């Protein structure tokens, strides 16, 4: 059995049988609704057909044309519909009896009679309908008759199911072959090629699936006994059961079953149960070592072919010498020929062994005679094993017909010692004279090449007379054929003869090559030397003769790129040295060639590798490699697969050649591969992983594209030069690049191992060590070198990440701080900081930084404050932990003061147990308190009147004492204008050093001091934050105007540049300038009024109304200078918003297509994206929405799911943009509260109706309409696919009993995608719920069960469950019925989800029922102490033992047995105690209320019989069947105890049976 034959299972699509539904069974309502019969037509198609309604033939042809354009899956569904629709007219004109006869003809598959009979009813139609039937007759005939072939119908139905794992291209290829009428074997061969290119794990998974399909089919044709055997036996034994089932069939069914049996034969044996394999190996191969047994087990586990497994067994067997080897061979031989006992007598078998010692050919003939006596199924099995068995039995015996036994062994041992080639062909040389043989031996012993020996043989042969030559040729021809007969089955022999007769030499050579692998090593050695002679004698053209191609031909074909001098050099090496030296020289010449020659050399040598590789590995294996490459396998994965294939070669010479060739070709391919990658990958790399570079940097890298080392170094240089957000982006992209390239080099499997380490939380060092180990295992030197280069860069990148996100205990590096938090320092200050850092005095370091911060002024101060605050957030959070960091953020968001936050930080630091870490945290906290204190003061000063003392101390140190005194006098008069003028007067009069010192401060300080507390925002700030979109020339112009002091001209120039901007620059400018407007206007009107403006915007108020409100607020400003500035800014901003509005209108409300394609339309293919861009450019937004919806409707499977997620996200984004954050939050709350989609939709409409801007409202309505459709489709998609219900829904409706912490745990597990783990966690939390919360949890989870189970099994099945519940069925019975419904689901994914839900729900329902049952359980220990004290110790022990064995029903019988054995006082004591027990337990079962009623009856004096009857009636009202059964059982015992006679009990039981009925 060959593992590759598993692919034959994809052909099961031709043969799986399912229930056949008659075409005369009209159960589809659409058959009678005209509007539904052609709903597949598009509106455009319907319109076109409408124009042809008066031209019936053209209408029919056009309809069929449209119909044939449908997707295959959709067309298949409609085909079934139209098959019945074609004959639905019969329902109106034929009686039930007549339709019954048509069904009989259909079941008999009598096509001609069926069609004749159908159309015999046509005359009963009116004339119009007759014409319709006639018009469509040809088409309908095809539909009606093609359904009659069950095999064809079923194969079409299941074809997709069995080839789902193929790529679309492969599926199409299979369908094309099927359509073209290709044979079973041809399709099988193609499918096997695809299958073998899959990973081993994927192959194993598919084999398991196909095996289940096989079993399912055979259980349909098996009887009940056989079905049980199929369920319980191992796969190998099932095959024998199957054969009996198939043998009973007849006709077409049998023909089909035989094909199924052939296809499934390997599957039902491909992987026997592990225990069976272990047992077989231990029993039949006991001579093996444990290690060898493990190897064989692994071969079974991997699904390797029986041929491979036998070859490995033979290899192990060949390695055993001495008595152990003899015993092992004897054991194998016994197992091999055990079957003979079934068909031959002991005498015949003994005679066979004698014959074996003298005549091998006669022995083989006799064995085949015995095989002929076997049943057909056993015969096939034995023939498959025969080559292997004969290999064992005959390997130590030579040809007894030609020489003595001992001589043979002598030769064999010589061969083992030094591989004598002459010995290998000696049976072909028995015509030589002794002296000629001696001459050949001399040549061989001299060490000459064996070709010299062959040349001498040819010379001797040439000396023979012609008659002798003819005689020898006939003999040789027979000898050439003998080895084939020895290893081939009879079926294979027939195939070989047919191939030979038809001159199908290509397939014949492949078959012979396969058979050679069954030979012993000595036999292969022989074939190797006589192959060409034999093929010549049999007139077979050796299609593999290429490997004998002369060096000259090879030079022309593959080495034409060499110079004449190089060619002469390699020729000389070829003739004088070994092949490895020859190959090395070729590589050396290639690598030293110029680029153009090297490219040609690579191309030629790759062709040589394909050519010779096919010769060595075989066409089939090369196809596997080709398919792997086509499917995107990495170079390393392909390389590893080639190594595996070579390892499987058993011929040592061929294997050696293969290794040599592989080594050479890997180098050639790696050179070509790397060159291709350089050309293809570099632009790809720039687009994916180096977007953080600017254009000049990218261009510089392009000039180095042929030098990886330089590129890596330059990237690191650029990377080291980045800071802030650019640095973070660079880290993120380069990490992705590292993951991608390392994976491409080491392969999928190793990459998964590395990923696993990361997920397990291993350190960067451990992960790096693992990567190094994996790279070191790469055999190809060039690939390993490339991997090492990439690793160096990646270590560097991940090192930076480690510094950015390192463990809390590590000291953050100065380099990181300089890049992110200390950029405001001057170069001199940085040098000071570095020197302190180098001596490792952290305390002094913090103090010095704070000193520099205190000395900073103006913009430097602002920048320092911002960066140091960021540093505080980063480092303190790093030291106190993520959770505490989040808590501080919440405090800040809730309005806590800095003091309160600082106090909380100190508490957290005190809780740190690590002394070193706590000290670091304390240092950082102390500095940060100062930073936040200074920042707060600085901000306060910034927003209030700056005092003169501060100014004199910090900014006017250049004044003399007299000037300072004058300023103080003016300051006290509160004449700020006079104060400003005086400062400028002093400044203008300054000279020399004083003037220089003043000038340094004038830009950042003096000017600020002059202005009011809402400082005039300087140009540098604007250029950094709001004018980054300007080019250098524009910025220069801005600076010139700014220096002139003309602010009006400055605003105009900004607007001029903005108006002139286009495309992305315009978009960026709009964003930045609007941000500037918000910032400056807020600065002028104050926070409170700015907040009101923000609320207006979010409420959808128009831009015009907002503008008016801003004007009102500005009018309220009392400071005229400030008001003038505010008006100037407002005027400019109105223009900016006007332009932005126009721009937004032109570009679809700022939501441009590029944004949408990147965020919400990634599921579109390139062609669809192109269509979208074309429509977008036309400006037709309505068409754009329609096109998106059209694509969405047409999407299927995973694409549909992804589209639903993205489009819903887009809806949330855009609708929020139209209705504002506040209203969007309300919508979100409604959704989380479980409000229906319809209600949410209404609320959105209400909010849109409140928008006053008509244009904005129109856009919002358009978006809303599209979103309703999207949510509708998504809802359908969920409903159609019984979606995996989302967690938000569950949390809101069914899991509200959980604490926040528990919900967080469940969300975290849910986020991993592991639904089973999610269910398990919910059940774990449910089991641990306190008793007071249990009822709520149980109620919610039961509601969830009803909801989800309904979703899975459907309304109809749910109605059945509901009916069972209402009729009093137990939870167990209901659970079993739900399991039946779930088992009937076809969708495997849906079934798995349903099974998970059902399993959890059984536990949930079990809680209440279990509690109920436990309430009614009799406590045996309590019963013994209260009601069974009359038992002796031995009897009590027996009762307890029954309890421990859980034989509770037997306990009652045993007690009554003991009761019957008592007498006298013991009997009375027992009766009294048991009566008390009866009262107690009956009360327990029927309840307090019913027990009270029974007591009243008893007190009224009714008879025991009447009382018993009443108890029986009461028991029968118990709803729970299990409890009712227990109560009945107790009552039956109590009747005996109370002395009710059997006859009386019978009367009472009549009533009991009435209730049962």
UniProtKB/Swiss-Prot annotation:
A GO term, aspect molecular function: retinol binding
- UniProt keyword Signal, yes or no: yes
Lineage, top ranks: Eukaryota, Metazoa, Ecdysozoa, Nematoda, Chromadorea
Q: What does this protein do?
A: Has high binding affinity for fatty acids and retinoids.
What SUPFAM superfamilies does the database record attribute to this sequence? ARM repeat
- Sorted alphabetically, which keywords does the UniProt record give? Allergen, Cleavage on pair of basic residues, Glycoprotein, Lipid-binding, Repeat, Retinol-binding, Signal
Q: Which residues form the propeptide?
A: 22-60
Q: What is this protein called?
A: DVA-1 polyprotein
Residues bearing carbohydrate = 997
- Signal peptide per UniProt: 1-21
Q: What family does this chain come from, according to its entry?
A: Belongs to the NPA family.
Which InterPro entries does UniProt cross-reference here? ABA-1_nematode, Aerolysin-like_pore-former, ARM-type_fold, DVA-1_sf
**Post-translational modification (record):** Nematode polyprotein allergens (NPAs) are synthesized as large polypeptides that are subsequently proteolytically cleaved to active polypeptide units.
Q: Is Repeat set as a keyword in this record?
A: yes
Q: Where are the transmembrane segments?
A: none
């Amino acid at each position: 059995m060959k593992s590759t034959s598993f692919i034959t299972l994809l052909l099961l699509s031709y043969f799986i049988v399912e229930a056949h539904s008659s075409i005369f069974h009209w159960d589809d309502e659409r058959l009678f609704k005209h509007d539904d019969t052609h709903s597949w037509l598009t509106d455009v198609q319907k319109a076109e057909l409408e124009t042809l309604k008066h031209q019936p033939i053209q209408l029919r042809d056009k309809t069929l044309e449209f119909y044939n354009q449908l997707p295959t899956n959709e067309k298949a569904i409609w085909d079934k519909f139209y098959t019945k629709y074609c004959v639905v007219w019969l329902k109106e004109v034929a009686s039930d009896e007549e339709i019954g006869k048509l069904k009989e003809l259909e079941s008999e598959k009598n096509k001609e009679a069926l069609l004749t009979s159908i159309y015999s009813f046509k005359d009963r139609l009116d004339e119009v309908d007759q014409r319709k039937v006639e018009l469509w007759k040809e088409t309908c005939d095809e539909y009606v008759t093609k359904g009659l072939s069950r095999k064809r119908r079923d194969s079409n139905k299941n074809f997709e199911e069995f080839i789902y794992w193929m790529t679309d291209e492969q599926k199409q290829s299979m369908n094309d072959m099927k359509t073209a009428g290709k044979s079973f074997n041809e399709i099988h061969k193609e499918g096997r090629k695809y299958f073998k290119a899959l990973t081993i794990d994927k192959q194993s998974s598919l084999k398991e699936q196909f095996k289940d399909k096989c079993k399912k089919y055979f259980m349909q044709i098996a009887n009940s006994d056989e079905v049980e055997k199929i369920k319980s036996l191992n796969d190998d034994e099932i095959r024998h059961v199957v054969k009996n089932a198939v043998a009973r069939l007849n006709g077409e069914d049998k023909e089909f079953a035989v094909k199924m049996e052939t296809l499934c034969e390997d599957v039902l044996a491909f992987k026997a149960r592990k225990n069976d394999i272990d047992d077989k190996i231990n029993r039949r191969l006991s001579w093996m070592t444990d290690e060898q047994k493990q190897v064989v087990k692994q071969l079974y586990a991997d699904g390797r072919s029986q041929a491979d497994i036998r070859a490995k067994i033979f290899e192990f067997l060949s390695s055993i010498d001495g008595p152990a080897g003899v015993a092992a061979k004897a054991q194998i031989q016994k197992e091999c020929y055990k079957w003979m006992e079934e068909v031959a007598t002991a005498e015949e078998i003994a005679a066979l062994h004698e014959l074996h010692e003298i005549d091998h050919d006669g022995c083989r003939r006799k064995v085949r005679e015995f095989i002929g006596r076997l049943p057909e199924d056993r015969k096939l099995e034995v023939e498959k094993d025969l080559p292997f068995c004969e290999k064992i039995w005959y390997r130590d015996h030579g040809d007894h017909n030609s020489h003595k036994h001992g001589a043979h062994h002598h030769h064999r041992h010589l061969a083992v010692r030094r591989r004598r080639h002459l010995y290998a062909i000696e049976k072909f040389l028995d015509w030589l004279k002794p002296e000629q043989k001696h001459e050949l031996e001399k040549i061989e012993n001299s060490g000459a090449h064996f070709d010299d020996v062959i040349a001498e043989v040819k010379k001797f042969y040439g000396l023979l007379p012609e008659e002798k030559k003819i005689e020898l040729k006939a003999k040789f021809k027979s000898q050439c054929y003998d080895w084939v007969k020895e290893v081939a089955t009879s079926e294979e022999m027939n195939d070989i003869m047919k191939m030979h007769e038809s001159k199908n030499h290509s397939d014949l050579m492949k078959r012979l090559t396969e058979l050679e692998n069954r030979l012993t090593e000595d036999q292969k050695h022989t074939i190797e030397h006589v192959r060409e002679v034999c093929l010549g004698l049999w007139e077979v053209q050796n299609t593999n003769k290429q490997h004998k191609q002369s060096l000259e031909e090879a030079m022309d074909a593959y080495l034409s790129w060499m110079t004449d001098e190089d060619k002469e050099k390699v020729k000389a090496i070829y003739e004088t040295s070994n092949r490895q030296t020859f190959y090395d020289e070729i590589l050396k010449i290639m690598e030293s060639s110029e680029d153009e020659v090297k490219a040609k050399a690579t191309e030629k040598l790759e062709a040589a590798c394909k050519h010779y590789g096919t010769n060595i590995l075989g066409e089939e294996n090369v196809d596997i490699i080709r398919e792997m490459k086509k499917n995107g396998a990495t170079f390393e994965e392909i390389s590893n697969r080639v190594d595996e294939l070579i390892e499987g070669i058993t011929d040592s010479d061929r294997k050696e050649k293969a290794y040599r060739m592989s080594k050479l070709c890997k180098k050639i391919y790696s050179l070509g591969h790397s060159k291709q990658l350089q050309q293809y990958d570099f632009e790809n790399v720039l687009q994916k992983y180096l977007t953080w570079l600017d254009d000049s940097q990218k261009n510089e890298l392009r000039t180095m594209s042929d030098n990886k080392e330089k590129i890596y170094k330059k990237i690191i240089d650029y990377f080291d030069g980045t800071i802030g957000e650019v640095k973070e982006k660079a880290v993120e992209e380069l990490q992705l690049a590292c993951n991608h390239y390392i994976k491409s080099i080491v392969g999928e499997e190793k990459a998964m191992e590395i990923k696993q380490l990361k997920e397990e939380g291993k350190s960067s060092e451990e992960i790096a060590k693992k990567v190094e180990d994996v790279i070191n295992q790469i055999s190809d030197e060039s690939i390993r070198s490339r991997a090492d280069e990439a690793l160096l860069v990646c270590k560097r990148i991940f090192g930076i990440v480690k510094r950015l996100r390192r463990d809390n205990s590590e000291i953050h590096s100065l380099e990181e701080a300089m890049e992110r938090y200390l950029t405001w320092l001057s170069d001199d200050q940085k040098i000071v900081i570095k020197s302190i850092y180098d001596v490792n005095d952290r305390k002094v370091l913090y103090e010095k930084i704070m000193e520099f911060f205190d000395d900073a002024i103006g913009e430097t101060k602002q920048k320092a404050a911002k960066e140091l605050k960021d540093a505080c957030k980063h480092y303190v959070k790093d030291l106190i932990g993520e959770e505490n960091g989040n808590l501080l953020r919440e405090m800040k968001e809730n309005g806590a003061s800095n003091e309160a936050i600082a106090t909380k930080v100190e508490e957290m630091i005190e809780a740190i147990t690590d002394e070193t870490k706590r000290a670091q945290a304390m240092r950082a906290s102390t500095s940060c308190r100062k930073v936040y204190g200074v920042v707060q003061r600085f901000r306060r000063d910034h927003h209030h009147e700056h005092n003169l003392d501060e100014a004199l101390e910090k900014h006017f140190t250049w004044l003399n004492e007299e000037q300072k005194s004058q300023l103080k006098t003016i300051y006290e008069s509160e004449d700020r204008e006079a104060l400003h003028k005086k400062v400028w007067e002093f400044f203008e009069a300054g000279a020399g050093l004083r003037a220089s010192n003043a000038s340094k401060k004038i830009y950042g300080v003096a000017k600020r001091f002059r202005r009011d507390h809402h400082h005039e925002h300087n140009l540098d700030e604007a250029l950094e934050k709001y004018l980054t979109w300007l080019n250098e020339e524009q910025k220069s112009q801005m600076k010139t105007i700014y220096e002139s002091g003309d602010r009006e001209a400055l605003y105009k120039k900004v607007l001029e540049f903005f108006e002139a901007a286009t495309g992305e620059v315009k978009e960026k400018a709009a964003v930045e300038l609007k941000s500037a407007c918000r910032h400056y206007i807020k600065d002028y009107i104050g926070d409170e009024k700015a907040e009101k403006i923000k609320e207006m915007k979010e409420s959808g108020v128009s831009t015009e109304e907002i503008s008016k409100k801003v004007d009102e607020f500005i009018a309220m400003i009392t400071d005229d200078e400030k008001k003038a500035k505010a008006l100037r800014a407002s005027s400019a901003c109105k223009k900016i918003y006007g332009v932005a509005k126009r721009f937004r209108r032109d570009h679809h409300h700022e939501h441009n297509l590029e944004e949408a394609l990147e965020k919400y339309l990634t599921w579109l293919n390139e062609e669809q994206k192109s269509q979208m861009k074309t429509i977008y450019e036309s400006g037709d937004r309505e068409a754009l929405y329609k096109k998106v919806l059209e694509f969405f409707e047409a999407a299927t499977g995973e694409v549909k799911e992804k589209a639903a997620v993205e489009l819903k996200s887009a809806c949330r984004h855009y609708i929020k943009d139209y209705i504002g954050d506040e209203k969007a939050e309300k919508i979100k709350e409604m959704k989380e509260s479980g409000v229906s989609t319809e209600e949410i939709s209404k609320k959105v409409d209400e909010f849109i109706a409140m928008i006053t801007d008509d244009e904005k409202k129109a856009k919002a309505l358009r978006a809303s309409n599209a979103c309703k459709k999207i949510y509708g489709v998504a809802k359908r998609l969920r409903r159609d696919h019984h979606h995996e219900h989302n967690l938000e829904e569950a949390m809101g409706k069914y899991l509200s009993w959980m604490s926040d912490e528990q919900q967080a745990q469940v969300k975290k597990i849910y986020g991993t995608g592991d639904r089973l783990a999610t269910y398990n966690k919910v059940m774990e939390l449910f089991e641990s719920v306190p008793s007071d919360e249990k009822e709520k949890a149980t109620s919610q989870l039961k509601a969830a069960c009803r909801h989800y189970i309904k979703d899975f099994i459907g309304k109809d099945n749910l109605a059945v469950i509901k009916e069972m519940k209402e009729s009093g069925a137990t939870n167990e019975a209901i659970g079993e019925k739900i399991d039946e419904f779930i088992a009937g689901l076809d969708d495997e994914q849906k079934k798995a989800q349903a099974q998970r839900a059902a399993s959890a729900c059984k536990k949930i329902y079990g809680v209440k029922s279990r509690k109920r049952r436990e309430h009614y359980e009799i406590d045996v220990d309590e019963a013994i102490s209260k009601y069974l004290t009359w038992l002796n110790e031995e009897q009590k022990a027996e009762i307890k033992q029954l309890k421990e064995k859980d034989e509770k029903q037997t306990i009652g019988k045993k007690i009554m047995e003991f009761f019957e054995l008592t007498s006298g006082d013991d009997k009375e004591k027992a009766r009294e105690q048991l009566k008390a027990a009866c009262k107690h337990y009956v009360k327990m079962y029927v309840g307090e209320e019913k027990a009270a009623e029974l007591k009243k009856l008893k007190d009224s004096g009714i008879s025991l019989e009447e009382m018993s009857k009443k108890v029986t009636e009461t028991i029968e009202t118990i709803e729970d069947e299990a409890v009712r059964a227990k109560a009945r059982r107790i009552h039956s015992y109590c009747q005996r105890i109370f002395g009710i006679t059997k006859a009386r009990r019978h009367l009472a039981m009549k009533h009991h049976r009435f209730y049962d009925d």
